[in-house]
Amino acid sequence: MCGIVGYIGQAGDSRDYFALDVVVEGLRRLEYRGYDSAGIAIHANGEISYRKKAGKVAALDAEIAKAPLPDSILGIGHTRWATHGGPTDVNAHPHVVSNGKLAVVHNGIIENFAELRSELSAKGYNFVSDTDTEVAASLLAEIYNTQANGDLTLAMQLTGQRLEGAFTLLAIHADHDDRIVAARRNSPLVIGVGEGENFLGSDVSGFIDYTRKAVELANDQVVTITADDYAITNFDGSEAVGKPFDVEWDAAAAEKGGFGSFMEKEIHDQPAAVRDTLMGRLDEDGKLVLDELRIDEAILRSVDKIVIVACGTAAYAGQVARYAIEHWCRIPTEVELAHEFRYRDPILNEKTLVVALSQSGETMDTLMAVRHAREQGAKVVAICNTVGSTLPREADASLYTYAGPEIAVASTKAFLAQITASYLLGLYLAQLRGNKFADEVSSILDSLREMPEKIQQVIDAEEQIKKLGQDMADAKSVLFLGRHVGFPVALEGALKLKEIAYLHAEGFAAGELKHGPIALVEEGQPIFVIVPSPRGRDSLHSKVVSNIQEIRARGAVTIVIAEEGDEAVNDYANFIIRIPQAPTLMQPLLSTVPLQIFACAVATAKGYNVDQPRNLAKSVTVE
């Protein structure tokens, strides 16, 4: 989500480009990240000049064509994915404050922006946008003028200490024609090192046409770049160093982060997708706050049935969510395929809450289900990854999954983000209705916050899974078994193989094995089994281990996904894929990832285009 570019060169050099050229082209390179507005600020003739526009970079180009910017060697630019405030010209970046002297662009979410806005308003600051970025820019201006004695680097360090959340900030000031100052925390920022010029970018795509030498910053660091050098400090002012690296891939590959496909990149994006979906949704006391849910609390307390509607992968995310929502809220919860929902005359009323899941927000089947639900008096919450799409506009309220753009047709990171957002909704309802005590909600949120790191641990072990996929590329059929939250994970694992490897695959509830599917088991049949935690409160673990014994006895090749330390599976598994220990309801965020990696490896070994599988489209906009 969002893209940032910064450039500084030398006055009077022989280059045939200026900051405007570098920054706008960098923004184009970052378009794949997804955005809804774009803008640029430059330093020229002792002043800050800027242009910004809702829409694509082409709209910004048109704005600049109408009102040209002067030549400059210093500039910053931004493509915005709306979070605080809608996708409008006013909310677009840069935000220019301090009587036009300071320009700031920002990626991320400032969690304490409301508190800071109140503080600054009391000091006489007026805000024209709805964004957290304008608040951060005004705080930087206040500190620059009152504490830092005109030192932009010091002001950025002190500002970083005041901000909470995830952010990358770039700033230029009319009083400094020789520098850009930037800060980062839990949001990417890379320095591009040139000769007589330097760059900043949210990733190397923003400057790869100009240099292959880059430096990665760590969290809570500030960098000041000039045309000839850069200096890195920590927020406390102490000196720091970055991590230099050479970019080995070309501009086209850079959009994929150096991976061979968007799907592979998006699998690797999943820790950030979950982290960003959680970001900004807790107050300073650790209480869950979903400001986006603009439905009266009395109505939410009166809900007596929840219906989740979705298609494809999103429907499986809904099936996972059902287990959690019913468990936490004690509200009957159904999951319906959106295209079947309105044709069976569902029983809905004003006490029904319909939750619609869609990555694109344009899935026609889901939109039609939502329209039918609202006609029956039900309230609708949309869980969506695309700001400004139709579904959030037609729903009563929306929760955005901040997974960033998902380019590959087969969904990966959106699936985990949808589960995460659905869990937040369930916890919020439980908190609101008094089904869970504050400490219980806090404990569950703590578990959710641990998931990005644990997902990364699964990804770090991907070579074993890739090798397995390559070795099984000639399989004719693969089966998947799971119980409880592992059942929809099994369905999703099968769907991934169907979508991108064109391989027959089926997912089953493991308890159904004796009721028919065991007839499919024959010598050499690969079967994935998602094993629940042995620390669960019921006997599901031992039952699934028995299932493994049954299929192994009939010649199946058993591929077991089990927690670290679960030794009960050792004697019955041909292959074991270990995942970190986690509470039962958190397991799908981990156990899904090996299945994605496996499917991608099988499809790649078969020579298929994993990003654009045959006959499929990313957004299904017809019924």
From Swiss-Prot:
Keywords linked to the UniProt accession: Aminotransferase, Cytoplasm, Glutamine amidotransferase, Repeat, Transferase
Subcellular location field: Cytoplasm
MF terms in GO: carbohydrate derivative binding; glutamine-fructose-6-phosphate transaminase (isomerizing) activity
Xref: Gene3D superfamilies: Glucose-6-phosphate isomerase like protein, domain 1, Glutamine Phosphoribosylpyrophosphate, subunit 1, domain 1
One CC-aspect GO term: cytosol
Gene Ontology biological process terms from the UniProt entry: carbohydrate metabolic process; fructose 6-phosphate metabolic process; protein N-linked glycosylation; UDP-N-acetylglucosamine metabolic process
Domain SIS, chain residue ranges per copy: 295-435, 468-613
Main location class: cytoplasm
Catalytic-site annotation from UniProt: C2 (nucleophile), K618 (for fru-6p isomerization activity)
Catalysis: reaction(s): D-fructose 6-phosphate + L-glutamine = D-glucosamine 6-phosphate + L-glutamate
Residue span(s) of domain Glutamine amidotransferase type-2: 2-228
Signal peptide extent: none
InterPro entries assigned: GATase_2_dom (IPR017932), GFAT (IPR005855), GFAT_N (IPR047084), GlmS/AgaS_SIS (IPR035466), GlmS/FrlB_SIS (IPR035490), Ntn_hydrolases_N (IPR029055), SIS_dom (IPR001347), SIS_dom_sf (IPR046348)
Enzyme class: transferase
EC number, UniProt record: 2.6.1.16
Biological function: Catalyzes the first step in hexosamine metabolism, converting fructose-6P into glucosamine-6P using glutamine as a nitrogen source.
HAMAP family per UniProt: GlmS
Quaternary structure, from the entry: Homodimer.
Name of this protein: Glutamine--fructose-6-phosphate aminotransferase [isomerizing]
Gene expressing this chain: glmS
